[in-house]
């Protein structure tokens, strides 16, 4: 009798994706982040579902409903902090996952890569709308500032902003629709993640060397399922340490003050994972220019397959490219730091320099270095 695992229409799909999947034998721990992202998404959906049972999306009661969750609901404080810090863990895994893709040339599978960039946008949109829901000071003013950026779009901008707000300012209508979208988007993200995997399994995984690995593949289970499990345990250890010991480490104290449209916080800033893009936005004195730079700072990822001019796929054997890759990483850390600082000297000029460097490395330096390396290897 043939194995049900290989014949059953549903189990067969799971088998081809997670059990009998031929996997390159040399993939390192950098390949763990896909499964960790799936794990983060599951945590976010489960904790979010339980939070939605007690949350009310009304401007009058939203803040107090979050307080009620933390004080009166059984383990409500745990669910709330797991959800808030789960977003941070999600973005840490996302940035490492994208960084791995850039370093090892995974963007050559451009369907998988482009779906991944769309996923990144969807996760960023979800996180932004989720940040508005507790209806604290930073929630309200963050929503006001970020949605207002759309007014920079010529001709339709102002109408578009008022349409998104559902009125002439961020109010009850805005909060209700943000809650609705925040609830539905994670399920769309889950569907997109399945498409992401579908495209990946069409080509098979990349590996650190960037070479074709068809002659050296091993089954995903038990080798990489155990490896992924270890990754999940390490993530859980870091995550629960964060949740149980320093739950407010990555949050903003201003969000413990109820939203007040008459009182602007001294420094309006988004969550830490958006600070790099926020710094790029602020470094351009023109509103429309800033918005375009903000969008392009993420959209630029879609250009990587076109900008890849090296004869080698991975950066593993390209020390010059490696050097500039790590300068790019350092530049992103600098932008993240600048995004959290007030708009004053010397932070303005540092932010502008870091923003120029970010686009220059990606659009000019890395392609040029790739050609130089080809030349050095007489290719």
From Swiss-Prot:
Single GO molecular function: ubiquinol-cytochrome-c reductase activity
GO cellular component, one term: mitochondrial inner membrane
Entry's transmembrane regions: 33-53, 77-98, 113-133, 178-198, 226-246, 288-308, 320-340, 347-367
CDD domains: cytochrome_b_C, Cytochrome_b_N
Membrane-related topology note: Multi-pass membrane protein
Pfam families (UniProt xref): Cytochrom_B_C (PF00032), Cytochrome_B (PF00033)
Co-factor(s): heme b
Co-factor binding details: Binds 2 heme b groups non-covalently.
Chief location category: mitochondrion
UniProt binding sites for heme b b562: 83, 182
Subunit text: The cytochrome bc1 complex contains 11 subunits: 3 respiratory subunits (MT-CYB, CYC1 and UQCRFS1), 2 core proteins (UQCRC1 and UQCRC2) and 6 low-molecular weight proteins (UQCRH/QCR6, UQCRB/QCR7, UQCRQ/QCR8, UQCR10/QCR9, UQCR11/QCR10 and a cleavage product of UQCRFS1). This cytochrome bc1 complex then forms a dimer.
Function of the protein: Component of the ubiquinol-cytochrome c reductase complex (complex III or cytochrome b-c1 complex) that is part of the mitochondrial respiratory chain. The b-c1 complex mediates electron transfer from ubiquinol to cytochrome c. Contributes to the generation of a proton gradient across the mitochondrial membrane that is then used for ATP synthesis.
Miscellaneous note of the record: Heme 1 (or BL or b562) is low-potential and absorbs at about 562 nm, and heme 2 (or BH or b566) is high-potential and absorbs at about 566 nm.
Protein family (similarity comment): Belongs to the cytochrome b family.
Protein name according to UniProt: Cytochrome b
Source species: Hylopetes nigripes
Gene that specifies this protein: MT-CYB
